[in-house]
């Protein structure tokens, strides 16, 4: 049996000193760094661990070069972050451009021109929260967040975010967990573009126009564009909210009172995320990924959001990730967030 231990190629380095008013206190905080001189061995282990197959030696060499770039990026992020960890994962041999093409799928261009949402109510989320909101809250604690799924190499994040939102709202209303079909949205939604991208608000519109959405079992996910199938649509929507997020304080209240929210972010800085609260997540690549906001809290004086991704449970914190709150991490404040409204019969 082969055992893979990337950590044997890691150096543990001192990170930061903490200074009190009159006393010097040294904080034992460390970060990890991969030994770049062992990049080839790390790559060989990576290829075997993740069953990577390349068409020829030329492609393998090109992937190794990308792997080294990602390795350097992981080291840089671990040196920068004192509350999160980044490490080699199954995506360590793809570039940022490939990530955007294959593993995201938010398509902002669908909101341009004359297209307008007919069923989603435009709602501005601004100002401070009104009423009492708990300091921390997570819908997973109420079992109202369904299992993490895998979108594969298909730009269908919009479908996964929208479906996850509906599944959560259904559980909140009925205390019943459902597994709904993302593939039906990929195949049948005529406004969004299947594996070539879409928006969560348009997904809700498509479900309303079609009369509902099917279960996963009769319409399983394939990760490729297919022909729309005529299956029974079990869950119906009566409307949706198209959120313009301007206040993270108010967003906290919306999340707590109404349920998980489909949000748009720039995910590139989190490609190799493993755990913890990422403090440094830019929007340099533009909004490109749809995920589900499920909770918030505070750890070691760092306020954070908790979000559900669609890259499988082996990524991040069992498929979830945390980013710093109240600093517009990953560009979370934008006008592309959305949430469904279940019909009275659903």
Swiss-Prot record:
Catalysed reactions listed for this entry: Endopeptidase of broad specificity, hydrolyzing substrates of both cathepsin L and cathepsin B
UniProt cross-references to Pfam families, sorted A to Z: Inhibitor_I29, Peptidase_C1
Signal peptide stretch: 1-28
Positions of the catalytic residues: 157, 289, 309
UniProt-listed SMART domains: Inhibitor_I29 (SM00848), Pept_C1 (SM00645)
GO biological process: proteolysis
Gene3D superfamilies linked to this entry: Cysteine proteinases
EC number(s) on file: 3.4.22.50
Residues with attached carbohydrate: 175, 230
Keywords: Disulfide bond, Glycoprotein, Hydrolase, Protease, Signal, Thiol protease, Zymogen
Free-text description of this protein's post-translational modifications in UniProt: Synthesized as an inactive proenzyme and activated by proteolytic removal of the inhibitory propeptide.
SS bond list: 154-195, 188-228, 281-330
Annotated GO MF terms: cysteine-type peptidase activity
Entry-linked InterPro entries: Papain-like_cys_pep_sf, Pept_asp_AS, Pept_cys_AS, Pept_his_AS, Peptidase_C1A, Peptidase_C1A_C, Peptidase_C1A_papain-like, Prot_inhib_I29
Propeptide section residues: 29-133
Function noted in UniProt: Cysteine protease that plays an essential role in host liquefaction to facilitate horizontal transmission of the virus. May participate in the degradation of foreign protein expressed by the baculovirus system.
Family: Belongs to the peptidase C1 family.
Name this protein carries in UniProt: Viral cathepsin
Organism (species): Xestia c-nigrum granulosis virus
Gene, per the UniProt record: VCATH
């Amino acid at each position: 049996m082969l055992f893979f231990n990337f950590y044997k190629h890691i150096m543990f380095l001192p990170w930061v000193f903490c200074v009190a008013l009159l006393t010097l206190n040294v904080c034992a905080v460390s970060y990890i760094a991969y030994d770049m001189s062992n990049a080839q061995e790390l790559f060989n282990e990576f290829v075997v661990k993740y069953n990577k197959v390349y068409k020829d030696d030329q492609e393998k060499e090109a992937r190794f070069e990308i792997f080294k770039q990602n390795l350097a990026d992981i080291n840089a992020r671990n040196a920068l972050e004192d509350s999160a960890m980044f490490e080699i994962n199954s995506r360590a041999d793809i570039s940022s451009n490939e990530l955007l093409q294959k593993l995201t799928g938010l398509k902002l261009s669908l909101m341009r021109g004359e297209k307008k949402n007919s069923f989603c109510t435009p709602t501005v989320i601004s100002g401070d929260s009104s009423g009492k909101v708990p300091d921390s809250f997570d819908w997973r604690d109420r079992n109202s967040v369904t299992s993490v799924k895998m979108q594969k190499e298909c730009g269908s994040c919009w479908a996964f975010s929208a479906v996850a939102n509906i599944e959560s709202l259904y559980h909140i209303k009925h205390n019943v967990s459902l597994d709904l079909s993302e593939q039906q949205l990929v195949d049948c939604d005529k406004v969004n573009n299947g594996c070539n991208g879409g928006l969560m608000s348009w997904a809700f519109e498509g479900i309303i126009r079609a009369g509902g959405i099917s279960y996963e079992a009769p319409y399983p996910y394939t990760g490729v564009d297919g022909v729309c199938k005529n299956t029974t649509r079990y869950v119906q929507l009566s409307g949706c909210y198209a959120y313009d997020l301007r206040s993270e304080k108010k967003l906290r209240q919306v999340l707590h009172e109404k349920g998980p929210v489909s949000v748009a972010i720039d995910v590139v800085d989190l490609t190799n995320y493993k755990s913890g609260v990422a403090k440094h997540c830019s929007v340099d690549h533009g909004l490109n990924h749809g995920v589900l906001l499920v909770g918030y809290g505070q750890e070691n004086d760092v306020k954070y959001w908790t979000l559900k991704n669609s890259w499988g449970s082996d990524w991040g914190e069992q498929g979830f990730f945390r980013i710093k709150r109240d600093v517009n991490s990953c560009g979370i404040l934008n006008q592309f967030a959305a949430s469904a409204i279940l019909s009275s019969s659903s």
